[in-house]
């Protein structure tokens, strides 16, 4: 017997990230964030490797990162618009969770599955934040993939990389719905083919099930 959770299905059918420009103060308290983190880290994790770790970025830290981003962009001669956009992400944030993928040596669990698990944490944190009543979004930006910047600013090791930064604030307005995938274009149905052999082991026919 199946047990249908209509409320959960409705949430998943209508969920969407909140654009940063629609969010304002306040951000979740530490106790409120712990609830989100507990829910957000319940993700597929083959081998129980926990190939990720989290850093909570509170406002003073985000301001410090914004300064580091500005300095770094200027050091590599970025255009002003590129620098401004990179800095703004951190300046505007009130509370962020840095999700760091941590590759673990494993003979059974390939690296790509560990990457998927870290990505699952990002989505799960967004969903947990939304379910808790907060505005949440998953932002990364090119700086988060710049090895020099993340090593110096976030203290990442050589086996680590940024999966995403999840921001939480208060929602001011519900965003308009956007186009969603057309299932008819992306889904194919494959049925099992049952082969029937004759006495000489040649295929006599197959039955589509």
Regions found by a protein language model. Give the residues of each.
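N-terminal amphipathic, basic helical "cap/leader" segment at the start of enzyme domains
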Residues: 1-92, 198-209
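Short, charged/polar surface micro-motifs in flexible loops or helix N-caps
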Residues: 60-64, 70-71, 103-105, 148, ...
